[in-house]
Amino acid sequence: MTGKKLLLIGSGGREHALAWKLQQSKNVTEIFAFPGSIGISQLEKVQLVNNNEMNLKDFKGIASWCKINHIDLVIVGPEDPLAEGIADQLKAANIHCFGPSKAGARIESDKSWSKDFMIRHHIPTAQYGSFIDALKAKDFIRNTPNALVVKASGLAAGKGVIVAENIEEACAAVDEILGDHKFGTAGDVVVVEEKLSGQEVSVLGFVDSNSVRILPPAQDHKRLKDNDEGLNTGGMGAYCPCPLISQQELDIVKSQVLQRAVDGLRKENILYNGILYAGIMLTHDGPKTLEFNCRFGDPETQIILPLLDEDLYDLMMASCTNHLCNVPELKFKSNINAVGVVMASKGYPETSTKGCVISGIESVETMDNHIVFHSGTSKNNKDEWITNGGRVLINIALADNLKKAADLATKACDVVKFDGSQYRRDIGKKAFQIHSLTYKESGVNIEAGNSLVGRIKSLSYGTHRSGVVGQIGSFGGLMRLNDIKYINSNGEESNYKDIVLVQGTDGVGTKLKIAESMNVWDTIGIDLVAMCVNDVLCNGAEPIGFLDYIACGHLEVPTVATIVKGIADGCRKANCALIGGETAEMPSMYGKGKYDLAGYCVGITEYDEILPKINDVHVGDVVIGLPSSGIHSNGFSLVNKIFQQTGFKLTDIAEFSDSHKSYGMEFLTPTRLYVSETLPFLRNGYVKALAHITGGGLLENIPRILPNHLSVQIDALTWKLPKVFSWLAAHGNVNANEMLRTFNCGIGMIIIMPRNDIEWETIPEARMIGSITQRDHNGPQVIVKNFKEVLHKEVTHWKKGDAETTSISYKDSGVDITAGNELVDNIKPHAKSTNRKGVIGGLGSFGGLFRINECGTKFEDPMLVLATDGVGTKLKIAQQLGKHDTVGIDLVAMCNNDILCNGAEPLTFLDYFACGKLDVNVATNVVSGIAEGCRQSDSTLLGGETAEMPGMYNPNVYDLAGFSLGVAEHEDILPKKNCLEVGDIIIGFPSNGVHSNGFSLIHKLFELTGYKWTDIAPFSAYGKTFGEEFLEPTKVYVKEISPALKTGYVKALAHITGGGLWDNIPRVLPYNLTAELDAKKINISPVFAWLSLNGNIDKLELLKTFNCGIGMIMIASKEHELEILKSLYGSRASVIGKIIPTKPHGHQVIVRHFATCFERVERLLSIPKKRVGVLISGSGSNLQALIDATKSTNMGMCSEIVFVLSNKAGIFGLERAAKANIPSTVISNKDYATREAFDVALHNELIKHNVEIICLAGFMRILTPCFVNKWKGKLLNIHPSLLPKYKGITAQKDALESGDNESGCTVHFVDENVDTGAIIVQEIVPIFENDTVESLTERIHVAEHIAFPKALRLVASGYVRLNDKCETEWA
């Protein structure tokens, strides 16, 4: 075949793309472009036609030129020549033209005709009217109920469409088009049509007189600015394929829009060979046609053609010759996406700026999978690319997913630079932006949670006893110890004096699986209480308070309310108040209908009544056994394994049941509570020890109360072995020793008493089952005589013939006692590292003991504060990444921050760790984090529970619950609601990121967007992965807030946890007061902006779900503001709002400017960081603070340190720069004859490193006015005083000599004078009575390390600038 010659008419980016694709055809040898462009001329097969050879308006001349030059095909890019009839003239000359006839082009050039055509041929479109009379058009508008779009009927370069917001705008548009003739003759007729709602998609197809071959759908972006704001343009970018249109909808467009159009044109004898472009709106009623275009779209063409896996010339010829029917469905690159971002010149679309030099085009063109198409470029006499139009060029990127392609294309625009360039950073966002996510859609139902709280409050209230203060729903449960009395050994009512608090935590293990299978939940709560209360009892303590933790996949309010009712029943039986709890809905960790429970009990006893009295236990003491009610709550993994292996069903009638109950109902018999019969018995002082027979059975639990040299000998003949145990032994072939090590075997509690004491006989069903003996050297501490024989006899009853079953052990069922013991050994050092005064004993006993009188604070009227929480689905990230060392900090922070909100000092902490298979290393890492959290909050890790529950958790999954106890004086308890008043200030404490709430929503977002935890987080300040950023631990506020609590001026604290700012602040307010916050004073972390953008999360939903940058708020009187802030120096806390009256029916939280500030942070995500240079002369402590801040995502610095310059060699500041991999240099002022010469050298070096902002961090040189003026508004300095006080180098000394009670530091813009520039930020530092210059200086340094990063952030982000009057101006 002879090589084909083509003529391409047009000069823009669309034509560049067409030429680029056509030259890839093996059939094409030459492409003539007219008028073309220099960009198009760079293509190998292209040559430009000289303007002297042709006139674009002279179609006969063009046809003649084609004949002379043997042109095989003419491709017409723009619509104007088609509308004027170029195709007709060429076809008349027997020249193939890819483009419709003049009559066919009318489908675009005459919108009134086009709308009528759609109606005639039943093409789905909007209702409309066409007018030449403005009055009639406006009358139609005023009488139409729908929102409207006003269009100039003719060609208006893509700008003649006005989407009216209201009737007035629509009428004004009519006046502009018909009255002012804004679009010339294109506006002789105006079309007014119904405004359709939905996503707009471009669908193009090759067509001839019969057939359609569809191209992949694309989406154009018409508005100038991000988020579809700004003026209408010809198109600022596009992407393809567009996933917003379904295959079903695309089929409708092909058949009911494009094919009907082709059929209609044929029926009306209109020639149409070319591209038919349909602008489609995806409405609720299906796809509707907005408009037709008669040519390739711009910029859609530029992103569709790189995906086309066909010969474009062949397709065009098939269209021109009516042979499309012979072309199979088109092929495109598989799993490839294309995104194009248009770069426009300054002033576009109203004007264009020409002649600006463009750099970076060649750099982008050399990148893999990048293409640059020129729309409006030229070259100057230096052979440099320059701007030559409104839309200058389009950067195309191809990638295997749309987000990546969009990111690459946008970053390419950062490489290509020219003065005044405009481009959008959100091209393609609509495709991967999911619908507006809510917390409820992620599986967490806040309303259900609130409903549950309402239902269980009465249950909780029914358990209250003396000492209880407040009710469920606050930040902790409160008990007033002075109100708790007991009957002493003399029978007198007495207050506790030397108080020891005994705390225990436990769960109910895989007994939950039985409850789940049977769907019977009313007694499992009793088990939970019994497991904790009985342990506390073993230390001689009276149980007084209880907390529960309930985790589930889906909160079914009736089920959880039933569980809590059981908990309340247990608490009433134990005279132990249910004063709080946590219900954690975690859809990505638990399946629907799946639950886990953990409980915590605190008891109270006198120091000299603590049990066990190990030193008082002697040979001959008697062992009393209290019968169990059945299996209780241990060993159920073995029970479940036996059922799994034998095939019995829980719903079958149990062979061992005397009351014909099913196996499930027998197994669900609740654990026996021993408080009521045992507690009075403890008061006589004869009891030496108690042992609760739980996990580990008789063999493991009794030794916990014995000295090493003694043992217990008990006789199985002294009590009746319940049938359930022999049945289990028989069907699981479990040996006697395994039974004794796994189950209670009928004895739920052991009491050790003196030999001659017979008071135990008053306890119902109590049995003397043995005595204390001398232990054989290294022999067992528990000897159970006759048990093997008793068990064998009972087992025989259940055996069927000679059938033997496989022997099953507890380890076989998935529970490894050895691993559990290894873990205890591993974590003991971690727990010990947290010890503080008051701790008694260590890990491994039945409860954790704490002596209040030794804690370091003397309490007159102590209040106990109890709190519980978990870490939620943040755990899932840790588990997927195998990073377990920080979630323990989260656990402690979530609990101890709540304790703090009551004005209390956290003292002790207990953890609950539940897993499917115990990995000792993982659990050790988790507990090491818990210990670190305890150290950060000065609380002690007093104990915990590790529950290995095969079948309830997958092997690599675990859940955590924490229980914290704090103490405060009664008069210091917060919130002081009665003291709150209008005008009080609200102080905000910055968060450390997301903390530990809202992660179910984050998981849902990741599920929908396809992000991975190992991907680099776009919002990260230091290139960390999503996983690393989201695992940043929750901030512990104890140490920074404690000094403020000691002032006595704090009225309330609110921990911003689940429910966000919206729901947590009202928890500390009376109904008549409202918190008014100012978002301009909150440093909103970039992570929240990223979540908002990518999850399309409504701003109110953000406030209801996340902390949004504030992890704790404090309320105090305005008059005490200075004292409070002085006590908080070094904490980054600041005033963010005030208390105002509540409006009728108003919410109790108002966040002013929230949407505006959030959107600003969202925009900052896509803006390159400001490049910062730091000038130093010394150790560089402020440099280090700036380095640390710019590497912290949560600081949101919008800047990076790219260069450090020193005027002195060998200083420590340079080492800091080197360690941070920041380039540095030394320019000594001694090497220059004048200050001016030195400053010129500084300036040149800073420019060389593209520095945009300079920070003077201890730079001991006075800069010249010339240098300062060059960097005006970009030069920051820090000074160690509250300017304008005490300028110069003796500021600290001056402050002390003046007798001031506060000093501080100031960050300011630098001007020509010393320390006189406009102030940006100040931090207050208190001056103490015995302060010296050195001590004050040291404290000011701490404040500087907060103030300088804060000021840099404000300037780099554009929140603060220096105006023309040299004053600080806030955005």
From Swiss-Prot:
Mg(2+) binds at residues 291, 293. Its EC number is 6.3.4.13, 6.3.3.1, 2.1.2.2. ATP binds at residues 193-196, 200, 223, 232. It catalyses: 5-phospho-beta-D-ribosylamine + glycine + ATP = N(1)-(5-phospho-beta-D-ribosyl)glycinamide + ADP + phosphate + H(+); 2-formamido-N(1)-(5-O-phospho-beta-D-ribosyl)acetamidine + ATP = 5-amino-1-(5-phospho-beta-D-ribosyl)imidazole + ADP + phosphate + H(+); N(1)-(5-phospho-beta-D-ribosyl)glycinamide + (6R)-10-formyltetrahydrofolate = N(2)-formyl-N(1)-(5-phospho-beta-D-ribosyl)glycinamide + (6S)-5,6,7,8-tetrahydrofolate + H(+). The keyword Manganese applies. N(1)-(5-phospho-beta-D-ribosyl)glycinamide binds at residues 1180-1182, 1341-1344. One of its GO terms (biological process) is 'de novo' IMP biosynthetic process. The record marks 1315 as: Raises pKa of active site His. One of its GO terms (molecular function) is phosphoribosylglycinamide formyltransferase activity. Trifunctional enzyme that catalyzes three distinct reactions as part of the 'de novo' inosine monophosphate biosynthetic pathway. The N-terminal ATP-grasp domain carries the phosphoribosylamine--glycine ligase activity. This is Trifunctional purine biosynthetic protein adenosine-3. It comes from Chironomus tentans. The gene is GART.
